[in-house]
Amino acid sequence: MNWITNYVRPRINSMLGRREVPENLWIKCPETGEMVFHKDLESNKWVIPASGYHMKMPAKARLADLFDNGEYESLPQPKVAQDPLKFRDSKKYIDRLRDSRVKTEQEDTILAGLGKVRGLKLVAVVHEFNFIGGSLGIAAGEAIVKAFERATLEKCPLVMFPASGGARMQEGILSLMQLPRTTVAVDLLKESGQPYVVVLTNPTTGGVTASYAMLGDIHLAEPGAEIGFAGKRVIEQTLREKLPEGFQTSEYLLEHGMVDMVVKRHDIPETLARLLKILTKKPVSAANDMNGGAIALAASA
């Protein structure tokens, strides 16, 4: 026991009235360097108030924000094999899983819920980027497949919010197997006649982009999101060319026809509701806002 650390320092701190400062009390905007109080950021849906920069939004917060009154049924996390390859790099994979579970309070990167958005029933699937980079492994793949099956059973649309670096390297070929599995799940939902909409968030890359993230009937994207397969630096080194400014951003992909709409986070629930009501042929209130025409155009494309 270190008596200075465990006894003397706490006594001095209490005498002087000093308090331990929690981590992440202030959060720095990567774009402008602005410091934002964490509660202000959370209340603004993790969007920097001054610049409008969209920070990564926790999966639980996104589901609560999406569904009416924050009410939804959490879909169960399927049980799968843990660390089947007994993988180890600089750290044991099983330890990485344990640390990520403590950090995020989730079993794995995928959270799925069934609820209503502006009165319309749907299943939403969200990646938690803070869980090993939102990577796609066996557990995530199984959770996604089960979510598509539930949407098919409920005869309702599914909305996907990817945020991922791609396939989980610690699971090797078992991770890559999730690409065709999730692709088949998308096809089964579409065969049932239900819409599949993807809301691309920052970042959406790698094997996730190569599979279910780019198979939607309609693709929305948050402002400034990085979307692509390989990273910009890898592409530049391979081609030995400088890439255009803003390459792989949601705005660039919108301009080049890869994304249907770029939608601010605050507008996503309303935009999704309008789109899905058009796609499912349900009554839609008159679109008086500027996005009304774009929504109708995207849905009819």
UniProtKB/Swiss-Prot annotation:
Subunit structure: Acetyl-CoA carboxylase is a heterohexamer composed of biotin carboxyl carrier protein (AccB), biotin carboxylase (AccC) and two subunits each of ACCase subunit alpha (AccA) and ACCase subunit beta (AccD).
HAMAP family named among the record's database cross-references: AcetylCoA_CT_beta (MF_01395)
NCBIfam families: accD
Localization annotation: Cytoplasm
Record-linked InterPro entries: AcCoA_carboxyl_beta, Acetyl_CoA_COase_Trfase_b_su, ClpP/crotonase-like_dom_sf, COA_CT_N
Top-level class of the enzyme under EC nomenclature: transferase
Protein name, entry field: Acetyl-coenzyme A carboxylase carboxyl transferase subunit beta
Its EC number(s): 2.1.3.15
Alphabetical list of SUPFAM superfamilies matching this protein: ClpP/crotonase
GO cellular component annotations of the record: acetate CoA-transferase complex
CoA carboxyltransferase N-terminal domain span: 25-294
GO terms under biological process: fatty acid biosynthetic process; malonyl-CoA biosynthetic process
The keyword Nucleotide-binding is annotated on this UniProt entry: yes
Keywords: ATP-binding, Cytoplasm, Fatty acid biosynthesis, Fatty acid metabolism, Lipid biosynthesis, Lipid metabolism, Nucleotide-binding, Transferase
UniProt similarity note: Belongs to the AccD/PCCB family.
Gene: accD
GO-annotated molecular function: acetyl-CoA carboxylase activity; ATP binding; carboxyl- or carbamoyltransferase activity
Key word Nucleotide-binding present: yes
Pathway(s) the chain acts in: Lipid metabolism; malonyl-CoA biosynthesis; malonyl-CoA from acetyl-CoA: step 1/1
Reaction equation(s) it catalyzes: N(6)-carboxybiotinyl-L-lysyl-[protein] + acetyl-CoA = N(6)-biotinyl-L-lysyl-[protein] + malonyl-CoA
Main location: cytoplasm
Known role: Component of the acetyl coenzyme A carboxylase (ACC) complex. Biotin carboxylase (BC) catalyzes the carboxylation of biotin on its carrier protein (BCCP) and then the CO(2) group is transferred by the transcarboxylase to acetyl-CoA to form malonyl-CoA.
